[in-house]
Amino acid sequence: MKKIISEIKPFARAVEQSLTRRRRFKEKLVHRFAQAVADYSLIEPNEKIAVCISGGKDSMLMAKLFQELKRRNKIPFELAFLVMDPGYNVDNRKQIETNADLLDVPITIFESDIFNSVVNVEKSPCYLCARMRRGHLYKKAQELGCNKIALGHHYDDVIETTLMSMLWGGQIQTMMPKLHSTNFDGMELIRPMYYIREEDIIAWRDAHNLKFLRCACRFTERLEGEGDAESASKRKETKRLIQQLKKSNPAVEANIFNSMHNVALDAVIAYKTKGQKHHFLDSYKEELMLPNDPMILLSYINTKLRDNYKTLDALCDDLQADKKEIEQKLSAIDYIYDAKLNRFI
């Protein structure tokens, strides 16, 4: 153990110690990272995970948290730290390499030409870029013997995505903590930063005076040059909306996050699962079907009359049921409706 510690660079060692010794970082970074891994079963024993590093604060912190989790050795797993260069300029590439060296993260860099592919796309270039990046990362991760890729999306990303899906997409969906790849057999995507707040990531970054990339793509650079980057991002607009709502309701962020853990399917008009759409009317009539067995029907009707309805007519109207049919079925077992008692006897 001493030999390992002596090989760690002094600055990296200080960063690692801050994660376990500073209360805020230990509770809000290390513990929440481990909690998400446990709650969503993100890591299984003996897996190899490709930690995908973009050069931003989120993914770099994720790399350090994975190293800390591995040091605990509660779950045996392997790590590869993967950086894709989609066409960074020299300065941005250098900054990623410098930060990785400074933080003692042994990165593997590979090149792609994604920026050139999307820079002239007018509609949704960011979405296309993200999709293409993910495909390249899956492919390289497989080549390295990994079965999962880990992305650095955090709690704030989750709630913003949830709200964006409603406001801009006309649907209800969220950013999932893990997903099966649809194009790479046996591969999964995990998001272990799921419980971590962006403000705590920023606090960690600033505590160590670290400088990370933001979005280094040419599309963003062009928009910033035109002064239009703010209006180009629906995510930024959604972020501002959440902050505005938070002024009158401090729990709004937690409520958005928790809403995706408390979906009442009985109270939605329609939903999709596995590519198939289900409408509440599909089962609406089935839910109102009365039991066929006369004795079960008797118990069901008498219970309803006792607890909720003053007359048989009211019950039948509410259930859209045929009163005569019910009376015939129950008369077959020698039960008739007594209006005074409001029950079948």
Predicted regions and their residues:
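Catalytic subdomain that performs nucleotidyl-dependent activation
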Residues: 79, 157-237, 241
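Short acidic, Pro/Gly- and aromatic-enriched capping/linker segments at domain boundaries
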Residues: 321-336
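ATP-dependent adenylation/nucleotidyltransferase module used to activate substrates
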Residues: 2-164, 168-172, 176-180, 199-203, ...
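Short, basic, helix/turn surface patches
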Residues: 132-144, 178-184, 238-259
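The feature marks non-catalytic terminal segments
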Residues: 210-284
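N-terminal acidic leader/helix
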Residues: 285-307, 311
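Short alpha-helical "recognition helix" segments of helix-turn-helix
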Residues: 315-316
